């Protein structure tokens, strides 16, 4: 088959696809030229990550395109229902990046609990002259052990995050549409431990959590899941983490909550208006920042590439 990896693919995935006899293009084609490239080269499958948008006009313009695979989890850059209605198979790689995203969230959580995000900004500028003052300023850290983490969206990424948090001695609450109990397995050395985690609704969990992490897709109506009302129900001084999608958290409400102290700190990996996030978010001292890199590890990208190759093989066998 002829396959275009428009946002690139890990060498392991490229090797697997080419070894299976597929013709693979890996250059990035600009949006205005993408339909023509697909049609001129008889492309059967389009591989994308988050950069390439697959909207209705592109789908209409490429009637012979057979499948679209999103390397990653969220598919809000693809008009999935429309593509499927027009006979195109649409898949993603939901399991491949879970651990990498969870580790990034834990990195933000550690940074915020000890003000590392801000001290790393100020030490190069003020560290020599104001060392004692900075030491005093950042001397009110918190241990994660004993804190309660609510994980909103308790799928693969949420459960992977739960494993890390439980390993740090945190109490974990899962947030999903159906309440109940979920068993989380922890591998410690050669032993396995199973821990029961309560699962409840968002509004039940909000007042209980010391930290809240979001792992849900962008909403179909474009509205934020966490706005000023939800933040008002949280514990004062809560830590809020978003490595899901920009817009899931109302950015105006977040800034207000940070300024008032309702939210003590926020770890933000995703933004409205990417790749040009708003400047006041970038400069806020209460925010630990990263540029949408949840799945950006070599290990995750290798797994994504190999999972894509496996999906292509499955599609080709039908």
Describe these PLM feature segments.
Residues 1-90, 207, 227:
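An N-terminal-biased, well-structured beta-alpha scaffold segment characteristic
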Residues 6, 150-153:
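Conserved N-terminal Rossmann-fold NAD(P)-binding element of oxidoreductases
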Residues 44-45, 67, 211, 239, ...:
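Short, Asp-centered acidic motifs that coordinate Mg2+ and/or phosphate
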Residues 54-59, 177-280:
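Rossmann-like adenosine-cofactor binding region
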Residues 65, 145-148, 228, 237:
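Phosphate-coordination loops involved in phosphoryl transfer and adenosine-cofactor binding
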Residues 86, 94-148:
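Phosphate-binding beta-alpha-beta segment of Rossmann-like dinucleotide-binding domains, i.e.
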Residues 157:
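Hydrophobic/small residue at the entry helix of a nucleotide-binding pocket
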Residues 270, 275-278, 282-316:
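Adenosine-phosphate binding glycine-rich loop
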């Amino acid at each position: 088959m002829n396959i275009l990896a428009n946002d690139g693919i890990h060498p392991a995935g490229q090797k697997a696809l080419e070894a299976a006899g597929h013709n693979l293009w890996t250059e990035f084609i600009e949006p205005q030229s993408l339909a023509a490239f697909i049609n001129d080269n008889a492309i059967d499958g389009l591989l994308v990550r988050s950069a390439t948008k697959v909207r209705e006009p592109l789908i209409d313009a490429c009637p012979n395109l057979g499948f679209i695979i999103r390397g990653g989890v969220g598919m809000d850059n693809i008009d999935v229902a429309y593509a499927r209605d027009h006979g195109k198979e649409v898949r993603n790689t939901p399991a491949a990046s879970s651990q990498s995203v969870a580790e990034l969230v834990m990195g933000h959580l550690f940074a915020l609990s000890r003000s590392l995000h801000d001290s790393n900004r100020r030490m190069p500028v003020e560290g020599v002259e104001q060392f004692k003052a900075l030491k005093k300023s950042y001397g009110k850290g918190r241990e994660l052990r004993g804190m309660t983490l609510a994980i909103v969206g308790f799928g693969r990424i949420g459960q992977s995050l739960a494993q890390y948090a439980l390993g740090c001695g945190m109490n974990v609450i899962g947030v999903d549409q159906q309440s109940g109990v979920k068993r989380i397995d922890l591998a410690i050395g050669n032993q396995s431990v199973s821990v029961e985690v309560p699962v409840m609704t968002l509004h039940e969990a909000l007042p209980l959590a010391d930290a809240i992490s979001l792992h849900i897709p962008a909403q179909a109506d474009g509205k934020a899941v966490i706005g000023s009302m939800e933040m008002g129900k949280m514990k004062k001084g809560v830590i809020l983490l978003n490595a899901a999608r920009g817009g899931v958290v109302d950015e105006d409400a977040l800034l207000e909550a940070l300024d008032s102290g309702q939210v003590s700190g926020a770890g933000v990996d995703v933004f409205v208006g990417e790749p040009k996030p708003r400047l006041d978010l970038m400069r806020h001292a209460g925010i630990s920042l990263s540029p949408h890199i949840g799945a950006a590890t070599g290990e995750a990208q290798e797994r994504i590439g190999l999972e894509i190759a496996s999906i292509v093989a499955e599609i080709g066998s039908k």
